[in-house]
């Protein structure tokens, strides 16, 4: 039985520990280590709910990782890599390739990239967004040249719930796993907002390079809109806080903020309000009426605004600008049966895995490598 080493660009959190089934590996008597290289990739990164455990090793410099690899028997290790492939991480991937590491990618966010046409992608793109797209293309081109010159290899095996990824081993999206555990749905007496901790989410600051801005105007806009929703439907709005959020309790007015219970909150909600989020999958799986919402502050992030437009196109539902909204026109809706099934079987699960659990798929495959 080979040792499993997971290398992450973030400190280990409770959520990562859960969706990657780390405790199940350990209970199966697998020798397991988590190599935290967050301070090398994103110096200064700190997350809430960081986990401390004896199997965690922390590295702040690439030479430290090199030394660890040199002292390890890499032929007897399966490396699960949770580090974004980009120009910033190129030397890290070269190091793993130089040491002939067996690399496994486990894509837990298979609904991030949506299958929409090039024309639909370009239809509403602004000039500044085109410049950003060209910059990203140039970086990808440079990265591919670097990989070719330095013989940087791709993952040996990839697990993913997305049908868009060729050669994958099918698994389920983590949200589908949660849904499978408790599929019965009842109507509660509330609407739920799927919070993304905008504009303070660590990914926005560290990975997308967004400058920290005040959330006050953004939150004021949401509070005003939530008042209108509550007046129209006679039900409260509950906030499903993002796992990385740090709220004091007054950000959304006198409204309940719940963290770590998004699946249950969506399951029992009357309707779902969101910008764009991987958690949209819960709305679709539980077959809930939903509404995509935006405002002036949210639109300042062109990447997120573009992602929301793509989601709108993919799901065929409109985006409501809550700063200029006529509530008589506001009408959350469910997806049609065909649209719902297309999304579920394209991004969340497959006919082969919908009755299986990721824990069994991953343990069964990885322990045989």
Language-model segment annotations:
Residues 54-69, 173, 180-181, 220, ...:
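Donor nucleotide-activated moiety binding/catalytic core segment of transferases
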Residues 127-207, 364-369:
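A nucleotide-sugar donor-handling region in carbohydrate enzymes
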């Amino acid at each position: 039985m080979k040792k499993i080493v997971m290398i992450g660009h973030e400190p280990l959190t409770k959520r990562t520990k859960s969706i990657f089934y780390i405790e199940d590996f350990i209970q199966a008597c697998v020798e397991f280590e988590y190599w935290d290289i967050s301070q090398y990739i994103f110096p200064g990164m700190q997350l809430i709910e960081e986990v401390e455990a004896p199997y965690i090793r922390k590295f702040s410099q690439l030479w430290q990782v090199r030394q660890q690899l040199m002292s390890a028997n890499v032929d007897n290790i399966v490396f699960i890599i949770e580090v974004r492939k980009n120009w910033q991480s190129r030397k890290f991937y070269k190091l793993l390739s130089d040491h002939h590491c067996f690399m496994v990618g486990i894509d837990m966010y298979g609904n991030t990239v949506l299958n929409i046409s090039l024309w639909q992608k370009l239809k509403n793109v602004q000039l500044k967004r085109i410049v950003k797209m060209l910059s990203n293309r140039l970086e990808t081109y440079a990265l591919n040249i670097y990989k070719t010159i330095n013989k940087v290899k791709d993952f040996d095996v990839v697990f993913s719930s997305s049908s868009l990824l060729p050669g994958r081993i099918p698994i389920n999206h983590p949200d589908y796993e949660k849904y499978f555990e408790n599929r019965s749905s009842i109507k509660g007496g509330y609407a739920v907002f799927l919070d993304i901790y905008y504009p303070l989410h660590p990914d926005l600051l560290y990975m997308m390079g967004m400058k920290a801005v005040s959330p006050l105007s953004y939150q004021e806009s949401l509070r005003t809109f939530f008042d209108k929703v509550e007046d129209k439907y006679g039900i409260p709005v509950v906030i499903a806080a993002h796992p990385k959020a740090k709220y004091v309790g007054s950000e959304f007015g006198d409204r309940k903020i719940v963290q770590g219970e998004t699946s249950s909150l969506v399951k029992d909600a009357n309707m779902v309000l969101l910008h764009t989020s991987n958690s949209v999958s819960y709305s679709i799986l539980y077959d809930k009426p939903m509404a995509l919402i935006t405002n002036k502050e949210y639109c300042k992030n062109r990447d997120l605004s573009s992602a929301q437009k793509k989601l709108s196109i993919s799901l065929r539902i409109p985006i409501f600008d809550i700063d200029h909204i006529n509530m008589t026109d506001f009408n959350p809706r469910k997806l049609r049966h065909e649209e719902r099934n297309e999304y579920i079987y394209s991004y969340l699960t497959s006919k082969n895995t919908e009755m299986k659990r990721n824990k069994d798929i991953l343990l069964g495959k990885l322990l045989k490598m």
